[in-house]
Regions:
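Post-transcriptional modification and biogenesis factors for structured RNAs
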Residues: 1-236
């Protein structure tokens, strides 16, 4: 049941990305979340540990959820003792909003912020895509597309080529196979070939030893290598 599996992964990823202080407000009790206690905390900048108003700083960014509306504006839970005010604006109850702290006193005042303006990593956005992989790649117009496969070329053989495209790319897709099928099989079932829809097919786990690698393990291993090879090297 791929639809149910997509929905499960979607809600688990959304739950993990949500700051801990907002989870009870934004997620109702449901069976899919019964084991979320074993999920590792992200410890990203938008998951602050501070719960005290006195420790907030002007200019700090926070994620908030609307708790009520007043004549003055909208009150938000931003993870401290009392709600913060965003003046002269009204938002639906429970809507999640990114804000910037502009005043700290008896009441914290905030302004609406675009998460793209935050100078730190501010979490991820989840999109459930129902198109087949090949159609997704072709329709989105990614600047760089990389497929991972044990049948791909060693990453070391194409490092320079990928680096050149990586420098100029604003949107990058990294594709992984499913637990029961690799990307070669998936694209063959779609009536096309993997090489025809992506720029590179690479093996990020050479000499893996096992017949298959779990998708979640391949994600960690591959993204760590790509980050080290390209993001860090290019910044230098």
């Amino acid at each position: 049941n791929q639809t149910a599996e997509m929905d499960l992964i979607n809600i688990l990823l959304a739950y993990m990305e949500t700051p801990q202080y907002l989870r009870k407000r934004l997620f109702r009790l449901r069976p899919e979340l019964r084991y979320v206690g074993v999920l590792p905390p992200l410890r990203t900048p938008h998951h602050p540990l501070n719960r005290k108003m006195k420790n907030l700083k002007v200019g700090e960014y926070r994620e908030g959820a609307v708790v009520s509306q007043t004549k003055e504006g909208t009150l938000l839970d931003i993870g401290v003792e009392h709600p913060a005010l965003i003046a002269n604006k009204q938002f639906p109850i429970s809507e999640r909003i990114t804000v910037k702290i502009i005043k700290i006193g008896k009441r914290v005042e905030v302004e609406l912020a675009n998460r793209n303006e935050v100078p730190k990593y501010w979490g991820y956005v989840i999109t459930v895509e129902k198109h087949p992989f090949g159609k997704l790649v072709k329709s989105r117009g990614f600047d760089l597309t990389i497929a991972t496969s044990k049948y791909g070329v060693p990453l070391a053989d194409v490092t320079e080529e990928i680096a050149e495209k990586w420098k100029r790319a604003k949107t990058i897709l990294v594709g992984f196979g499913a637990p029961t099928q690799g990307l070669y099989e998936i694209l063959e079932n779609e009536g096309t070939s993997l090489e025809s829809v992506v720029d590179f097919v690479v093996n990020t786990i050479p000499m893996q030893g096992t017949e298959t690698v779990r998708t979640e393990e391949a994600l960690i291993a591959s993204l760590a290598i790509l980050n080290m090879k390209f993001n860090l090297c290019i910044r230098r």
